[in-house]
C-alpha cells in the first residue's frame, strides 16, 4: 500500500469532550501540523461557552462553532419525514441524519482553510465512522481521512484520561458515564452500560427528554399540524419554520411521554446493538405526515413509496446521504409530496400519539364512494366482473392442478 503523505492541515470534528480533546493533542503530537477544530450545534443542548478557548488551549489553530440547527431540521429531518424513513421499522435515524450535515460543514471549512485532511472521533466498531467518511469521500475525495481510534495505541478510557492529564488538557471526568449518549434536534440516544444486556429494563432516571408515560398528564393534549408539500408549516395555526416545529413538538411530546423506543438494531458493520431512544418531536411528525398521505396519495403511489421508504432509511443509516441512489430516491420522495397538503389532528396522551382527524383540499377520500349507507356513485354489481377477471389466474391454476 502506498504510504500517505503527512498532512499539513487537519479539520477535526470536535466536541470538547474527552475523546476529541485527546485526539486534538494526539494529532499535534503525531503529525506536528495545524489542526482546526470544528463543532456543530445540531440541537445537542450542550454548553458551548468556553469551547473555543478550550480548543485553542488544547492546540487548535482555529475553532469553528456553527449553529446548524435550522439547516438540520430543514434539509435533513424534513426530507427524512417526507420519505417516511424509519430504519428496521422503528429507528427514526436521529444520529444518522446529523452526521452527513456535520461532515458537509467540515468539508466547507476544509475548502475555505485549504486543509488536506479530516479527522473524527468515531470508533472502529460503529456506524459513525462510515457516515463521516462516506460524506468526506463524496464531497472532498482528494483529502486524507485520519481515524485515530483505528490506528493509535490507546486501549480505552483510562489511557485517554492519563494522556489528557499528561498534556494538561482540562477534562472534567472522574468516572465513566453510565451510558453513551448522542443528542440532537431529532432524538437523544442511549447505549452501553446496563443496556448492553438486552433483557435489562432501562432505569427511569436515564430519560431526559420524556416523562414516564405513567406520570404524564391525565388530560390529553390536542394539536393541529398543517402541512404543505409534505412539510409541517404550522402548529395550531401558528406558522413556524422547521426548527421551531421540532423544538415545539419535542417539548409537547416530551411532556406527554411520547417517543420512547427500545430496540436491538443491525449496525452496518455487522454488529447487533441495543439502543434506547427518545424521539418525541420526530415521532409526532412522522405519524401525522404518514396519516395525511393516506388521504392524499393514490393507492399504488402509496404502496410503492412504502417499499422505497425502507431503502431510503437504509441508505440514510448506512451513511449514503450524498450517493447517486439517494439523490434519485429523494427526487422520487419529493415528487410524491406535491399534493400532501392539509391538517392532521393529533392526540397526545400518556406515551401515545394518536391521529384523531385529518383533512385536505387534495383529499382522495370520497364519502360518497365509501359510505355504508345507500349511495349512487358506486354500482356494486360492477364488482362481479372485476372479481372474475382479477381471479382468473387463480381459477386457471386450480383447474389445471387440482
UniProtKB/Swiss-Prot annotation:
EC id: 6.3.4.5
Positions annotated to bind ATP: 13-21, 40, 121
Main location: cytoplasm
GO annotation terms (biological process): argininosuccinate metabolic process; L-arginine biosynthetic process; urea cycle
InterPro entries according to UniProt: Arginosuc_syn_C, Arginosuc_syn_N, Arginosuc_synth, Arginosuc_synth_CS, Arginosuc_synth_type_1_subfam, AS_cat/multimer_dom_body, Rossmann-like_a/b/a_fold
Tree of life domain: Bacteria
Catalytic activity of the protein: L-citrulline + L-aspartate + ATP = 2-(N(omega)-L-arginino)succinate + AMP + diphosphate + H(+)
Keyword line: Amino-acid biosynthesis, Arginine biosynthesis, ATP-binding, Cytoplasm, Ligase, Nucleotide-binding
Pathway as given in its UniProt record: Amino-acid biosynthesis; L-arginine biosynthesis; L-arginine from L-ornithine and carbamoyl phosphate: step 2/3
Subcellular location: Cytoplasm
NCBIfam families hit by this protein: argG, PRK00509.1
HAMAP family given in the database record: Arg_succ_synth_type1 (MF_00005)
Family: Belongs to the argininosuccinate synthase family. Type 1 subfamily.
Name of the protein in its database record: Argininosuccinate synthase
Species this chain originates from: Leptospira biflexa serovar Patoc (strain Patoc 1 / ATCC 23582 / Paris)
Organism lineage string: Bacteria, Pseudomonadati, Spirochaetota, Spirochaetia, Leptospirales
